[in-house]
Design a protein with these regions (language model features):
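Short hydrophobic alpha-helix segments
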Residues: 27, 70-73
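N-terminal strand-loop-strand
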Residues: 1-37
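The catalytic Nudix box helix
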Residues: 37-70
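Nudix hydrolase/Nudix homology domain
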Residues: 30-35, 96-138
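Structural detector for helix-capping/boundary residues
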Residues: 9, 40, 54, 106-109
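Active-site-adjacent beta-strand/loop module that shapes the phosphate/pyrophosphate-binding cleft
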Residues: 65, 72-100, 104-108, 119, ...
């Protein structure tokens, strides 16, 4: 495995739903059966926050605002080590399928069941108190 770590940024995109916060998941590019958060590379000169917003736009057609930093996860894929820095992104948009990906909005429990990877489930659990506070119904 390479000693270099590939830095990426991801977005936990949320919006207010009729019965509580809704969480956006998209299918993976390499494996369309995997459900994940929008994420990807950080362009040269781009901040992690801006990269997270760009990935949400590119992969799900959603424009939003970074509301909080959620945390980071690391994983190995092939011969590389990745570190993904996640941000909670709020939006009032529904998005549109892009880049050959499907997208779905889920409640918290449904998102936990649908997410493919344990690391993503752990990240959602960590971010959930912040999401609930941000999208508290008035």
């Amino acid at each position: 495995m390479s000693s270099n770590v590939i830095e990426q940024a991801g977005a936990i995109v949320v919006r207010r739903g009729r019965v509580g916060p809704r969480i956006l998941l998209v299918t993976g590019r390499r494996n369309p059966d995997n459900w994940i958060f929008p994420k990807g590379h950080i362009e040269e000169g781009e901040s992690r926050r801006d990269a997270a917003l760009r990935e949400a736009r590119e992969e799900a057609g959603v424009k939003g605002a970074v509301a909080a930093r959620a945390g980071s996860i690391s994983f190995d894929f092939g011969r590389s080590r990745y570190r993904v820095h996640y941000y909670v992104v709020t939006t009032d948009q529904r998005g549109q399928e892009r880049e050959g990906r499907r997208l779905r909005w889920h409640g918290y429990r449904q998102a936990l069941r649908r997410l493919t990877y344990d690391e993503n489930r752990a990240m959602l659990r960590t971010a959930w108190p912040v999401i609930r506070t941000l999208l508290r119904t008035r």
